[in-house]
Design a protein with these regions (language model features):
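Short secondary-structure boundary/capping elements
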Residues: 24-28, 101-106, 125-129, 152-155
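Short catalytic helix/loop segments, enriched in acidic residues and glycine
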Residues: 19-34
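Conserved beta-alpha-beta core of the PfkB/ribokinase-like small-molecule kinase fold
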Residues: 119-180
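Conserved N-terminal subdomain of the carbohydrate kinase-like
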Residues: 11-23, 40-121, 135-140
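Thr-Gly-centered strand-to-loop micro-motif
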Residues: 26, 48, 146-147
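Gly/Ala-rich phosphate-binding loop of Rossmann-like dinucleotide-binding domains
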Residues: 37
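Active-site metal-binding loops of divalent metal-dependent hydrolases
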Residues: 7-9
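Extreme N-terminal starter segment of soluble prokaryotic enzymes
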Residues: 1-4
Length: 180
């Protein structure tokens, strides 16, 4: 496996100065994997979804060459949900709702084929989960990228700082950088 992305596959409500979209497919892992599909042929995704997540969206990922063996489906539960409002400059946002749902008890188990990935993208998850994923790798990837947000800085800063010591690249906006 060349690239493994671990993160959220979710539903989002997004409000911008130009409009609003409700219950759209969201999540960092969703869009990281879709974007990477233009450049990487051998990639996998690790996440958890509820029974409410549309199967056709998983099929779409597979059609893009994204291996979805690492997506756990909890049929009786709801998928992660995030709602946010972006401001005029699109860098500043307010988190309105974070419903962890299936993510609340997510314990990712990397498929064996994923554990030797050359590149690892740790999406927006709890720092404890991010650390657990790092510890599941057979060897340190060539590059480890981490995404996080204000929510985790607010409730799990010590864990986040520990994970930061084991990554190469951090992707946050200017507001999050000031908060960190």
């Amino acid at each position: 496996m060349k690239l493994v992305t671990v993160g959220t596959v979710a539903f989002d409500d997004i409000e911008t100065p130009r409009g609003r979209a409700e219950m759209v497919i969201g999540g960092a892992a969703t869009y990281i994997s879709r974007s990477a599909s233009f450049f990487v042929e051998n990639q996998g995704i690790v996440s958890v979804i509820g029974g409410d997540f549309p199967e056709d969206e998983l099929e779409e990922m597979r059609s893009l060459g994204i291996n979805t063996d690492g997506i756990e489906i909890k049929k009786e539960e709801k998928s992660f949900f995030w709602a946010g409002r972006y401001h005029d400059n699109m860098n500043k946002r307010d988190t309105l709702i974070t419903d962890l749902n299936v993510l609340a008890n997510f314990e990712p188990k990397l498929p064996e084929a994923y554990r030797s990935a050359e590149y690892l993208m740790l999406g927006n998850l709890t720092p404890d989960i991010q650390m657990d994923v790092l510890n599941q790798m057979h060897k340190r990837p060539k590059l480890v990228v981490l995404d996080t947000m204000n929510f985790w800085m607010d409730i799990a800063l010590d864990g986040l700082v520990a994970v930061l010591k084991r990554i190469d690249v951090l992707t946050i906006n200017d507001e999050e950088a000031r908060q960190l």
